[in-house]
From Swiss-Prot:
Keywords: Cell inner membrane, Cell membrane, Ion transport, Manganese, Membrane, Transmembrane, Transmembrane helix, Transport
Membrane protein topology class: Multi-pass membrane protein
InterPro entries attached to this UniProt entry: Mntp/YtaF (IPR003810), Put_MntP (IPR022929)
Source taxonomy: Bacteria, Pseudomonadati, Campylobacterota, Epsilonproteobacteria, Campylobacterales
Protein name (Swiss-Prot/TrEMBL): Putative manganese efflux pump MntP
GO molecular function, one term: manganese ion transmembrane transporter activity
Organism of derivation: Campylobacter curvus (strain 525.92)
GO CC, one annotated term: plasma membrane
Major place of residence: membrane
Record localization: Cell inner membrane
Signal peptide bounds: none
Length: 184
């Protein structure tokens, strides 16, 4: 359940961009939607794995404070998403851009997943399973978001970011409280 909530939260930047693209590109074909969702999903799956590898390189040095780091990273990312929801800007229609431009958008929306991957190195997490769930959830949500964007547009974009931010803050708080309670 936790990994599904995390996957949902991490996908929100990509979902917001997919909603914006759907709202601005009302002539999206099914293949264009799938291409966009696939690129976002693949990057969303790869970034936590890269973060995990990065985190393993220094986990022994920070094992005593890893819960504070996880709380800080998730709290910061959650707050950032909530603030971004109040400062939404017009995004270009990514659908008419090249695969390279879609990949750049996917990297930009999956930086949070890289940071979360670092926290995986501190926890007892099945990284392969988690990354597959994260990528799959992102793919499914982005596919739906392109179509929802055609109907509801910009109104939903900000709501998705707020929800994702609240979930990240909640997960970070849970990690911190669980660790503190376990060490009382």
């Amino acid at each position: 359940m936790e990994i599904l909530l995390l996957a949902f939260a991490l996908a929100m930047d990509s979902v917001a961009l997919s909603i914006a693209s759907g709202a601005k590109c009302r002539t999206l074909s099914f293949l264009q939607v799938l291409k966009t969702a696939l690129i976002f999903g693949v990057f969303q799956a790869l970034m936590p794995f890269l973060g995990y590898i990065l985190g393993l390189s220094f986990v022994n040095f920070i094992q005593e404070i890893d819960h504070f780091i996880a709380f800080g990273i998730l709290g910061f990312l959650g707050a950032k998403m909530i603030l971004e929801a109040h400062h939404t800007k017009d995004e270009p229609c990514l659908i008419n851009l090249s695969s390279k431009d879609l990949a750049l958008g996917a990297v930009a929306t999956s930086i949070d997943a890289l940071a979360v991957g670092i926290t995986f190195s501190f926890a007892n997490v099945d990284v392969t399973y988690s990354c597959l769930i994260i990528g799959t959830v992102c793919f499914v949500l982005c596919t739906a978001a392109c179509y929802v964007g055609k109907i509801l547009g910009a109104w939903l974009e900000a709501k998705a970011l707020v929800l994702g931010g609240l979930i990240l803050i909640g997960l970070g708080t849970k990690i911190l409280i669980t660790h503190l309670v376990d060490h009382i």
